[in-house]
Amino acid sequence: MKSAVETGSGLQTMTYREALRLALREELSRDERVFVMGEEVGLFEGSYKVTAGLMDEFGEERIRDTPISEEGFVGAGIGAAMVGERPVIEIMTLNFLLVAMDQVVNHAAKVGAMFGGEVRVPIVIRTPNGAGNQLTAQHSQSFDGWFAGTPGLKVLAPANPADARSMLKAAIRDDDPVLFIENLPIYKLKGEVDTDDDNPARIGRARIAREGTDLTLVSHSYATVRCLDAAETLASKHGVSVEVVDLRSLRPLDVETVVESVARTNRAVCVEEGWPSFGVTAEIAARIQKACFDELDAPVERVGMAEVPLPYSKRLELEAMPGEGRITAAALATLEGSGVLRP
């Protein structure tokens, strides 16, 4: 099976899924040490078809199907990385990575420091998270903050196809363990990708996804898509100019870009798909409060998942999620509280 998306064909429109597949194909071709391993990544072509066609192209040795044992094959990947290989592990959902949390947190993230830098662990763990597909409480969680709080582990979460390709390439070439977080609804998102540009992204750099002057929305992954929708609504219906900062990387975290934005707009709303208590938005809000204390015209607001096990009901699921409506409401409340808008 040959993909319609090819390297070196200039600027192309492709889905997030296709951008990931292109990055994998490019890195598998570039470096023989790279291999892919996970449940159904080969014959079935991946649960989300990211690895479609790769087994036909690179063979069973480099596109390896595994048993249903996340702890086992993540551990095998760590071992392979320690002896010089560059494994890319696919986990069907971030929820299942909890089964292998000891391998990730106590081994992959710590081996480099415990061996004084003499041993590196260049492993990439790809996995989607998030809600919106009626997969209920155990398959709809976002544990981004849990892993981002672990020293020694890099955590990336791109929000568009171009970043998905360039950041996955960067992750594969990095000498440290990288958790590469994707999102189920975002796989079908389309965007332009420059296939002539083989340069990997710089890990640890946020991007300004939309410029604005009245308020800053800070987010990552699919929450960035929702923030961009909210920013458009705020502009068209309320005349508000909103800046959107896409973090892209949770660890390392680009605090400087966030702080520079909030210092300009004087207001911030932080958005994540996870539960807000002890989460990513709590960390971002704390960083903003410390660095921008004198510039803030209103308290930093946070929007996240309702703090309940997610129900199956579609209506209740949507109400629990940090959608465009809740983000817009939080932004308006922040603006009204600082006198920009009248209630």
Which stretches of residues belong to each language-model region?
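Thiamine diphosphate
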Residues: 1-177, 181, 318, 343, ...
